[in-house]
Regions:
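Feature recognizes metal-dependent phosphohydrolase scaffolds
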Residues: 1-635
Length: 635
């Protein structure tokens, strides 16, 4: 039904629209364009989480679009190509520059090879472009050869002999001009752009893998991307903004997992002063282990001060350094007396009233690290991007995306949290946490910077949702103290009523919406399902990082949303560029249909489509204003 326009005086919106569409013809053209787009199939969305710095696997998944390109190649070429030919063609699309160099070295990059593969790329791109309006295609094509690629895509050789001759001459001319390599590279880029319209990354680029910086560089080049911060992300964000507790934790984690390259090579942050200092303190330890011990004590000192000045964070039970009985080599906790694994604490005065006081050397090292983190250009560039494209949660196209949890009580109610005299629960708490993270970025005030550390590991943090027991795991031999109680949310994800309550809290349909989470690795090898509560919740942390492969039994998940529904891919094995070039190795995945649409979802069914509908209403009002003389169109 056509929207009912308002015939009265033109408002501000109409006057602004009239500047953009000054004639009736311009309004009509835009209306027709938008109305047509509404019935196109919705774009393909890919959801991934918990990449944890595993660049090689991510790079391959990005290039093969989680296996979608191979599926399209199978569909387009079927029995016309052998299995081996398809594998080699896919590798060419994934890594065109490297594959062309390999074929050239093997003297296989002949004119016939170029013509054949450019024609294959053309057929593949033509099929994949049908979801897009023709006017948008040029914007998806690399600029250097755009005019010829647009012409090739527009040819219809099956319809007319002249069109066939035209296409054949274009292909022959490309090879004659020695431009085959450039065209293959640009066609490969176009195919990847057509395969995925939007990427959603549900947190945690950082942690154990060695190249989160390289992952972020790749993601920054993607056209349509959003990020839902993970606890590891906000830790690094807080460190880049100058939080001493976040910095000490980042340094400790990097040392603990032998992952200092990302600091030193990726971000230009030197740990040499810390290592030199630590070697004097712990001469019998390996340099990295000594530095880890020094960073650990530094962390507990600055964490203790942070907790003391922020009682509303609810972390008082994590301030434990003063519980060490140095003479009896034990820790006296509320739960009992526990033996220490190590008894040597050279930077703590055992007779001091306050063990949290930094030594002069510790203060100098910490000040140097704060300077290095806050002045790293590459880290700042990445953190700017995380803030620009990121948020604590996102509501998009009927899905609720967030990394961790919405804090709940044991019976599934939204936990009420008091901060600075105000009470928050459910969505209001996540909104407040998002605001505090942005305040840290904008104003660098102490309270907001401290809040970033809380978001990393606080029991009531929606990004953590568990009591992180670093002190016990570091110092105590009794492993019963190591258990980290988690928020009831994680247990209640299997409960449909709870998931429906969460969806409703965020304005989504409790019967049709989906919660999409990361954070908690799904133990697929033990039979655990990532699909919870009858499909209302989907956990997509499948362990991209090699350190988690043994725990999950797979190499990660990709959730795919297209016009036909939701599909979850469990990646059993992920090739890398070397494997792909050596033997055309690829990704091996098991697909599970989470939800099958009864009718194809169109652009009009999406959030973008609803925004288009609003624009259409405004344009009809503008057209009526022109027709009724309320506004005068330009001649």
């Amino acid at each position: 039904m056509r929207p009912i326009p308002h015939p009265g005086r033109p408002g501000k919106i109409l006057r602004l629209l009239a500047e953009k569409y000054p004639t009736k013809e311009a309004v009509m053209s835009r209306l027709i364009y938008l109305q047509g787009q509404l019935v196109l199939p919705k774009g393909v969305e890919h959801f991934m989480s918990d990449l944890h710095g595993e660049y090689a696997a991510f790079y391959h998944i990005l290039n093969n679009c989680s296996g979608v390109i191979r599926e399209k190649v199978d569909y387009v070429f079927g029995a016309r190509m052998s299995k081996e030919e398809k594998a080699e063609f896919c590798t060419l699309i994934y890594y065109p520059k490297e594959k062309i160099e390999q074929m050239t070295a093997a003297r296989r990059a002949t004119p016939a090879w170029y013509r054949e593969n450019i024609a294959r790329c053309l057929a593949l791109a033509r099929l994949m472009s049908w979801k897009y309006p023709a006017s948008r295609l040029p914007g998806l094509i690399p600029a250097r050869l755009r005019p010829v690629l647009v012409e090739l895509l527009a040819t219809r050789p099956e319809a007319d002999a002249a069109q066939l001759a035209y296409q054949q001459r274009l292909l022959a001319s490309i090879v004659q001009a020695d431009a085959g390599a450039e065209f293959l590279e640009d066609f490969a880029a176009l195919v990847k752009r057509l395969a995925v319209a939007e990427f959603h990354f549900v947190g945690d680029f950082f942690d154990r893998g060695g190249r989160p910086d390289a992952i972020l560089d790749r993601i920054m080049a993607l056209p349509e991307v959003d990020i839902e911060w993970g606890n590891h992300d906000v830790l690094w964000m807080g460190a880049a903004l100058g939080s001493p507790a976040c910095i000490a934790t980042v340094v400790r984690n990097s040392l603990r997992y032998d992952n200092v390259d990302v600091l030193e090579r990726g971000y230009g942050i030197s740990l040499r002063p810390l290592v030199t200092f630590a070697q004097h303190l712990y001469p019998d330890e390996a340099p990295i282990r000594a530095a880890e011990r020094a960073a650990t004590i530094l962390l507990f000192k600055v964490e203790g001060a942070l907790i003391e000045r922020n009682p509303d964070l609810g972390m008082a039970n994590r301030r434990l350094l003063h519980c060490i009985d140095f003479r009896n080599v034990c820790a006296v906790l509320p739960s009992g007396r526990y033996e220490l694994r190590k008894a040597y604490f050279p930077t703590i005065d055992e007779d001091a009233v306050d063990p949290y006081v930094l030594t002069l050397e510790e203060r100098e090292i910490l000040d140097g690290l704060v300077t290095s983190f806050t002045e790293s250009p590459s880290l700042r560039r990445h953190v700017d991007f995380l803030y620009r494209k990121g948020s604590l949660y996102l509501v998009r196209n009927g899905n609720l995306l967030f990394h961790g949890c919405v804090p709940l009580t044991e019976d599934g109610a939204f936990r009420e949290i008091t901060y600075d005299g105000k009470k928050y629960a459910g969505r209001a708490w996540l909104d407040f946490c998002d605001q505090m993270a942005r305040a840290a970025y904008l104003y660098h005030e102490q309270e907001a910077l401290d809040f970033m550390y809380f978001l990393w590991c606080g029991r009531l943090s929606p990004l953590s949702g568990r009591e992180v027991r670093t002190f016990e795991r570091t110092f105590l031999a009794d492993k019963t103290t190591w258990e980290e109680p988690a928020d009831p949310y994680y247990r209640l994800l299997d409960d449909e009523e709870t998931c429906e309550r969460v969806l409703k809290e965020f304005g989504l349909s409790p019967k049709k919406g989906h919660i999409i989470n990361g954070h908690v690795p799904v133990k697929v090898k033990k039979g655990e399902s990532p699909v919870k509560a009858g499909g209302r919740a989907i956990i997509i942390d499948g362990g991209f990082c090699k350190a988690y492969h043994e725990k999950t039994g797979i190499s990660g998940f990709t959730l795919i949303s297209n016009s036909r529904g939701l599909r979850l891919l469990a990646h059993q094995k992920i090739a890398d560029v070397r494997t792909a070039l050596a033997d055309n190795g690829d990704i091996e995945s098991v697909a599970e249909t989470v939800e099958l649409a009864t009718i194809h979802t169109t652009v009009g069914d999406t959030d973008k489509g609803r925004a288009m509908q609003e624009e259409i209403t405004d344009l009809y009002n503008l057209l009526l204003a022109y027709q009724n003389g309320v506004l005068k169109p330009q001649a």
